[in-house]
Amino acid sequence: MVYDLERTKGVLWLENFVMLALTGGEGPEDSLASFLTSFIRQGQLRIVSEMSLEQLEVMRRLVPGFVEHFQIISVSEMDTPTSLRIFEYFNQYTNRTININFSQKALELSYVLLDRFVRYESFPGKAIRFLQTCANQAFLANRRHLDVPDVIGYFSQQTGIPDFLLRDDLLIDNESLHRFFLARIKGQNHVIDKICSIIKVFKAGLNDPNKPVATLLFAGPTGVGKTATAKAISEYFFGIGQKYQPLIRLDMSEFQHPGQIYRMIGSQGKLVQHVREKPFSVILLDEIEKAHPLIFDALLTVLDEGMLIDDLGRLADFRNTIIIMTSNLGGTQRSSLGFKSYQGHDFEADIRAFFKPEFYNRIDVFLIFNPLDEITIRAITLKELNEVENRDGIKQRGLKLF
């Protein structure tokens, strides 16, 4: 191959540049990249290829010095008009080859959704992949025309994002929204009002696009429904029993020591991996006060810019996440779990005294959960008993708990 290219003065196009470092012997020194280095240095071989910035770093790490023999040309992402023109060309191609046609509004919506929710890839590549998948699924379903509802359905199916968040209607039934949370959260009406407001702001697209959807801190004694509220928010967006499990729950007591930090925010960390796999998620950081202080410093970037870069330089995008932190500061006595003896306690003062101002000030909403009175506890008990009684194993046996 090298002889033919040198003789004809041809140019070698490599589709997968990283494979040069992975093909050959057991180590990098025996790889195909090392073998070709001398030919490239002497001008006997001319190569053109393409790769992402992440792949470039991998090549530099696997075969030091090899990439430096190439002239690197940075290609920026296409602007909106150019991307839409490529959409139209692709639509003409699918119409000609498999008789699938996208409406103009469907193409424009595809761009908007991909730009907002899919941020690890660039245009037009991510658009072509998405439209190709839509066209293939429509072809298998014997459909020939795709409009806005079809694009929303396929996008929701591929990303796990609820379709009602993707539709353009801005109105949310306020009564049904409150009713949903009232059925799941007892004795915390002020919390429900604030959560409903956050959801309506997000649905209307009025939240800051360069930050997480919302950053919430739930404070109060143990057993008043802080974790249950986070689960209810996740259930509202995604439902129960779905294949896509969007609630990312981390017990912060597992990250108390400096050596444990990378288990959360490193390249193999729980939080980074979950967010990269599920960019639209509800993140629950349980008992945040137990985490090592260095984690608070790392979270500053997440709360302020909606981004986190791991130790390999890879980006984790938090701009479509809801971050919920719970804290028991000031409410750790076990003698009265969530009862009225905590009435009047200044939980906010405890939180302010514990966290640095730069961390506390980046929290969007600080919610103090009320202690539970006897009537509320009775209602919660009946609700839990009803759920147990309705389990399949109990119903099949015809058992009654009360």
What is the predicted function of each stretch?
Residues M1-F402:
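AAA+ P-loop NTPase nucleotide-binding core of proteostasis motors
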